[in-house]
């Protein structure tokens, strides 16, 4: 590597709200593991990851693969939460935008049969 080259750390260009959300996720994972009284070594073994990687997850490290976070949540019995993350039913912004695009009035064209009774 040349002298002027910089090594970019994963996550250094993430927006602050993303960094905070990952840290909170890591803390929540740590709390869940501790409530279950599972030692880090045992939890990491169950997730087929190293103890070091598990600790990175608990710190909310953005360099850890999303699949690793999913395995950790599976080990803790929380994997069903992943499916709800971007569920359209919980997307208040998307639902509001969709509602704004709905037509105010619906008119039937003359001469064509309507789809109703």
Regions found by a protein language model. Give the residues of each.
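The DNA-recognition helices of helix-turn-helix-type DNA-binding domains
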Residues: 50, 61, 76, 89-90
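Short, charged recognition helix plus adjacent turn
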Residues: 83-117
């Amino acid at each position: 590597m040349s002298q002027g080259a910089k090594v970019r750390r994963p996550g250094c260009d993430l927006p602050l709200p993303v960094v905070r959300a990952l840290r909170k996720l890591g803390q929540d994972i740590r709390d869940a593991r501790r409530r279950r009284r599972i030692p880090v070594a045992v939890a990491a073994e169950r997730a087929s990851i190293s103890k070091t990687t598990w600790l990175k997850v608990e710190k909310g490290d953005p360099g850890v693969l999303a699949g690793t976070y999913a395995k950790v949540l599976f080990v803790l019995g929380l994997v069903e939460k992943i499916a709800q993350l971007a569920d359209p039913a919980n997307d208040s912004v998307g639902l509001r935008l969709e509602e704004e695009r709905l037509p105010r009035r619906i008119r039937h064209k003359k001469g064509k049969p309507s789809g109703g009774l």
